[in-house]
Amino acid sequence: MMSAGFQWGGVPNKGLTQEHSTDKSTTDSHIPRYGSSSSSSSSSSSSSSSSYALTSSSASSSTTPHQTISHSPLATTLKKRKREDTSDVNLPINNGISSKRFVHPTASSKYKRSKTPKIIGQPLPLHRLIESLDKSNLQKLVQDLIIIHPELQSTMSKIAPKPTIQDSLDLLHEKFNMIISHLPYKCDVESDYSYLRIKPHLQEFLSCVSDFILNYLPPLESNMIHSLQFLEEVTKMIIHNLPNFTNQEFQYTKSTALDQLANCWLIVLSQSDNNGEKEDVAADIGVVVKVIQELELLEKLQKHNEVSLNKFQKVIDYCNDKLEQHELIINNGNAASVNNNGAVPASLSDLISVDYSKYSLTNTSSI
């Protein structure tokens, strides 16, 4: 038996049709309809989309003015994209860059590139560098330069200014003060321990004395007074001011130094004897005697000779010999001024005789 409401040939049942229409009328028009039952075909997308369009149109026509129209998610997304595109067109491009153009510049942004070249650090010029060096650093610089370039020794010796006597003596006094300053306080000044402490400074002092004495000897130094003044100061420092150490090595060194000093005195005083011109002997003796008297050399040499155990006796003898020769020359000159008969030479009027006969008045007519 067949159930009630079933019909062959696909004729719809009236009851089902009415129920379906009732459901269609009672459903909300705002909700999209994708199908009535699970038995409806889902394979045809075109029929479902067309039914969706018809349903939407029928729903929009049947709605009242108080009802709102619902949109599908796809349409809403498209409209949102359209609004965003429209808003993007109206907005200015690159808001960050455009806003920076209206910002007031700060102190760093006001910097303008200068047309002058960039200032960079530079080393000091050579003359400024030399000016900034002290004495010790300048000496070291010159010595290192000579060691690196030995060929500069002759050039520097030629162009270097000659030291004055006072400059030379100041340097010697500085070397001598180094000896005195290194003497021990709680020990005998003349002991061996004291000598060993000052030995390096003593050697430096004697070396400096030797170098400067050679610089003030003839023929390099032609001024006798300058040479004798320097020798006097050096002799005074070595004989009278330097402690007399009991060390045997020091005694031998001091004795040798005094012998050399005495020889230097003789070399300076006798420099005029080597000229070889006998005509100028009297004049040369007069120059030496004048220097001896002005500098009071005999008195000074006597003091040096007493302390040095007659080391300067030969210098004293030479000075006395020059004084005697000068006295003889003066006496011989006075004797030569007197003639052999003891008569005084005739006056100038007696030596001149003129014949006035040619200039007499009688001879004027013949002229």
Swiss-Prot record:
Compositional bias per record (Polar residues), positions renumbered to this chain: 63-75
GO annotations of cellular component type: cytoplasm; nuclear membrane
Compositionally biased residues, Low complexity: 36-62
One matching Pfam family: Cut8
A GO biological process held by the record: proteasome localization
Region feature Disordered, mapped onto this chain: 1-93
Intrachain disulfide bonds: none
Amino acid composition bias (Basic and acidic residues), ranges on this chain: 20-31
Gene3D superfamilies for this protein: Tethering factor for nuclear proteasome Cut8/Sts1
Annotated localization: Cytoplasm; Nucleus
Principal localisation: cytoplasm
Oligomer status and interactors: Binds the proteasome.
Function field: Involved in ubiquitin-mediated protein degradation. Regulatory factor in the ubiquitin/proteasome pathway that controls the turnover of proteasome substrates. Targets proteasomes to the nucleus and facilitates the degradation of nuclear proteins.
Protein's name according to its UniProt entry: Tethering factor for nuclear proteasome STS1
Source organism: Candida tropicalis (strain ATCC MYA-3404 / T1) (Yeast)
